[in-house]
Curated annotation (Swiss-Prot):
It comes from the Bacteria. The keyword Transferase applies. Belongs to the CobT family. This is Nicotinate-nucleotide--dimethylbenzimidazole phosphoribosyltransferase. GO terms for molecular function: nicotinate-nucleotide-dimethylbenzimidazole phosphoribosyltransferase activity. Pfam families: DBI_PRT (PF02277). The gene is cobT.
């Protein structure tokens, strides 16, 4: 497993920045003042560079919603009981969740991935069964996952991305479902980005002040308990992460290895993206951060990464909802790039010198 993981990392190539001039020249020749479409032009530029072409296409999109349970839920850090995780997976499989509506609206396929739910699901056409274990261990008492389990989850996610590329998908999005997963996400940010737990811990699904203070204490305890196992990014992910977070990390690494961009959802998915970046800094150029989460700390995380999310809608649901919305903006930017007339083709006079 370790050899395959190292091969995955080695297969991630830097993007070709030499495309920049050709893409910019085309954007500047469109029938508009240069730069007047603002971030749409930036997004089109990034997509072209990530995909390695000045003639981009986007015909197939897919959202992967990774699900997993967390042992740390036993510490009472969430407003909801752990059994909500499988219940929400069933809701997604039945078409009733927000991500079902928004992925459909975006014209994206949706697949739910069981990475570590504490429940056994029957086969379903929308479900991919990649279960590593029935939930992570309680990170407040020791490592959430072993290194082998973490690698298994990462490689499963990577294989999903590589398979999607082979099936003709050109853009992927991440989502997640897992009660208590803002707790491991916050711990990952704290260690990997050297951020204060107190400053970035939020209310998740809506906990009160008393439980928020308790959540902060649990995260700080988990970091201290696992202090001896935090030497590398992989060890940090194993000790303080979760199966769905590791799966998303793998999806990002796998997509980058085949030159495919990924739209990252909110607070949880961004923690997986941080893990992927720490494992291979080259993946940054393949990532679109979809939205600024309303979860406390996400703004500071984005600033640390030097990232500017596409949307700011006060979302804090997860599931991939923000990523599905942002996919539509990316698609709009590419339609501008591909379908607008140029000054030369339309016979429109350019700007006076």
């Amino acid at each position: 497993m370790t050899d395959r993981f190292q091969q995955l990392l080695a297969s991630i190539k830097p993007v070709d920045m030499n495309l920049t001039s050709a893409v910019k020249a085309h954007l500047d020749d469109l029938t508009k003042p240069q730069g007047s479409l603002g971030r749409l032009e930036e997004i089109a530029m990034k997509y072209c560079i990530a995909t390695g072409t000045s003639k981009p296409s986007l015909s197939k999109k897919k959202v992967f919603c990774f699900a997993g349970d967390h042992g740390v839920a036993a510490e009472g850090v969430s407003a909801f009981p752990a059994e909500v995780t499988p219940q929400m997976v069933y809701n997604m499989l039945g078409g009733g969740a927000a991500i079902n509506v928004l992925s459909r609206h975006a014209g994206a396929d949706l697949e739910v991935v069981d990475m570590g739910v504490n429940h056994d699901f029957a086969e379903h056409p929308m479900l991919r069964r990649c279960k590593v274990k029935h939930g992570s261990a309680n990170m407040a008492e020791g490592p959430a996952m072993s290194i082998d389990e973490t690698l298994q989850a990462i490689m499963a996610g990577a294989e999903l991305a590589i398979e999607a590329r082979e099936q003709g998908y050109e853009l992927l999005a991440t989502g997640e479902m897992g009660i208590a997963n803002t707790t491991p996400a916050t711990a990952l940010y704290s260690v990997l980005l050297d951020m204060s737990v107190n400053a970035i811990t939020g209310r998740g699904t809506g906990i009160d002040d008393e439980r928020l203070h308790h959540k902060i204490a649990v995260i700080e305890k988990a970091i201290e308990v696992n202090r001896a196992n935090l030497a590398t990014p992989l060890e940090v992910l194993a000790a303080l992460g979760g199966f769905e977070i590791a799966g998303i990390c793998g999806l990002i690494l796998g997509a980058a290895s085949v030159g495919m961009p990924v739209v990252v959802d909110g607070f949880i998915s961004s923690s997986a993206a941080v893990c992927a970046i720490k494992l291979s800094c080259k993946v940054s150029d393949y990532l679109f951060f979809s939205h600024l989460s309303n979860e406390q700390g996400h703004r500071a995380v984005m600033q640390k990464l030097g990232a500017r999310p596409i949307l700011d809608l006060d979302l804090r649901l997860g599931e991939g909802t923000g990523a599905a919305m942002a996919m539509q903006v990316i698609e709009a930017s590419l339609k501008i790039y591909n379908e607008m007339a140029t000054f030369s083709s339309a016979g429109v006079s350019g700007k006076n010198d």
